[in-house]
């Protein structure tokens, strides 16, 4: 039999996640467990001296525990086994002797430190929430004694205060911490698993948006707005493409195909040092294609004259390596005389587009939802939508939206007219004739 090949540091470092958790053996029972999410855990398989049943030892998370350190822990465990001593019992006793080692806060901070892939901003925010809402209540508690009700108490307090989103995130964090405790043999089972359904159902946030009957008024105010050229272009592109704020603010020039009039927004972007959330790509974590209308291409060509020599479409005022403020579009809307809390905000452009596209009766729901990059809850339908993309229909649809806005510059064009006319004509011929009839 060929001797088992041992791991080397390079293999450990470059091990990539797969669809399912898998193991990489090092010998002597030691192996690296690589989760589907990319986390790497050192474990050792052995048989308990008392009953000869197979068990597992947890040695920690890579890279906090290196390959050499994991081997040293394995060797120590083997010495104990030779003496008929269960290394897991010794491991637990050693942890108990370490003052505070079993407190919820100690384990939570260990879990926090193990998440090496997080951005600094995200790491700080996660820890700040735990320090603010969780540690004051259960931080000093022995994690082995915590029950579901203990874990829920501080989270329910946050939920009752109306901070439902914060409470949901805290529930996720506490569940992950307790899962980490199970995986590292601090506890045998996860009481946080039973917290599901205990919090208020979070209602979808609705952003203020203008009805289509007010499009002429809005477009007139936009035409009269005399802010910075880059700001005006940002507002117009936001309206024409109805993408999310971060998707536009962090856009790079290399995402645009000018020959095909397409914008490919990546699932994730390279982070800009010192810029919060600059790593954000698509909310749904997959590439999104935005067909660009003629009007959008004109704006992009204008913008290229201003920032085309930079990486970003919308660099900061004083530092080209930074990006324009997240409040830029809403500030412009306020300067135009709108209340961004009750009348219209930048995110409300998505609602305005969704309403007009749907009311027109010209476009399939699949094409509209795909263009809005909404998640599809039905898995079978989602697979179909993802495969087909509906790109040809979406090209027509995005041009229709831009043309419809243009047509509303001087007077309101009712969507009821479109609904009453479309049944006689197909999309292409109908739209051409309709545009000619209202000139």
UniProtKB/Swiss-Prot annotation:
The active site is at residues 244, 273, 347, 350, 374, 384. Residues 205-398 form the Tyr recombinase domain. Residues 102-182 form the Core-binding (CB) domain. GO terms for biological process: DNA integration; DNA recombination; DNA-templated viral transcription; establishment of integrated proviral latency; symbiont entry into host cell; viral genome integration into host DNA. CDD domains: INT_P4_C. Its EC number is 2.7.7.-, 3.1.-.-. GO terms for molecular function: DNA binding; hydrolase activity; transferase activity. Keywords: DNA integration, DNA recombination, DNA-binding, Hydrolase, Transferase, Viral genome integration, Virus entry into host cell. InterPro entries: CB (IPR044068), DNA_brk_join_enz (IPR011010), Integrase-like_cat_sf (IPR013762), Integrase_catalytic (IPR002104), Integrase_DNA-bd_sf (IPR038488), Integrase_DNA_bind_dom (IPR025166), Integrase_recombinase_N (IPR010998), Phage_int_M (IPR053876). PANTHER family: PROPHAGE INTEGRASE, PROTEIN INTB-RELATED. Integrase is necessary for integration of the phage into the host genome by site-specific recombination. Belongs to the 'phage' integrase family. This is Integrase. It comes from Enterobacteria phage P4. The gene is int.
């Amino acid at each position: 039999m060929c001797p088992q090949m041992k791991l080397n540091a390079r293999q450990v470092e470059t091990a990539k996640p797969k669809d399912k958790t898998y193991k990489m053996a090092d010998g002597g029972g030691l192996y690296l467990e690589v989760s589907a999410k990319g986390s790497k855990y050192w474990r050792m398989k052995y048989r308990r001296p008392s009953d000869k049943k197979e068990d597992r030892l947890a040695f920690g998370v890579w890279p906090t525990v290196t390959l050499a350190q994991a081997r040293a822990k394995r060797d120590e465990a083997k010495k104990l086994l030779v003496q008929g001593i269960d290394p897991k019992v010794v491991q637990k006793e050693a942890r108990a002797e370490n003052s505070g080692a079993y407190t919820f806060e100690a384990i939570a901070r260990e879990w926090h430190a193990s998440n090496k892939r997080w951005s600094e901003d995200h790491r700080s925010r996660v820890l700040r929430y735990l320090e603010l809402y969780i540690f004051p209540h259960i931080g000093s508690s022995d994690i082995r004694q915590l029950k579901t009700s203990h874990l829920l108490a501080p989270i329910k307090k946050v939920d009752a205060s109306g901070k439902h989103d914060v409470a949901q995130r805290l529930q996720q964090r506490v569940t992950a911490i307790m899962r980490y405790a199970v995986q590292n043999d601090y506890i045998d089972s996860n009481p946080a698993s039973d917290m599901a359904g205990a919090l208020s159902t979070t209602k979808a946030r609705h952003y203020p948006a203008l009805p289509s009957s007010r499009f002429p008024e809005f477009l007139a105010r936009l035409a009269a707005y005399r802010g910075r050229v880059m700001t005006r272009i940002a507002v117009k592109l936001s309206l024409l493409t109805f993408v999310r704020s971060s998707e536009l603010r962090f856009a790079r020039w290399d995402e645009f195909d000018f020959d095909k009039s397409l914008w490919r927004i990546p699932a994730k972007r390279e982070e800009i040092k010192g810029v919060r959330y600059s790593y954000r790509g698509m909310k749904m974590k997959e590439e999104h294609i935005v067909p660009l209308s003629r009007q959008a291409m004109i704006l992009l060509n204008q913008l290229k004259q201003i920032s085309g020599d930079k990486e970003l479409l919308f660099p900061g005022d004083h530092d080209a390596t930074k990006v324009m403020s997240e409040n830029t579009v809403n500030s412009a809307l306020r300067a135009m005389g709108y209340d961004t809390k009750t009348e219209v905000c930048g995110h409300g452009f998505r609602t305005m587009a969704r309403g007009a596209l749907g009311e027109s009766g010209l476009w399939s729901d699949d094409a509209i939802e795909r263009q809005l990059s909404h998640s599809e809850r039905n898995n079978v339908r989602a697979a179909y939508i993802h495969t087909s993309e509906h790109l040809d229909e979406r090209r027509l649809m995005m041009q229709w939206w831009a043309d419809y806005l243009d047509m509303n510059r001087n007077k309101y064009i009712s969507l009821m007219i479109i609904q009453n006319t479309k049944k006689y004509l197909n999309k292409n011929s109908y739209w051409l004739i309709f545009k000619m009839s209202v000139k």
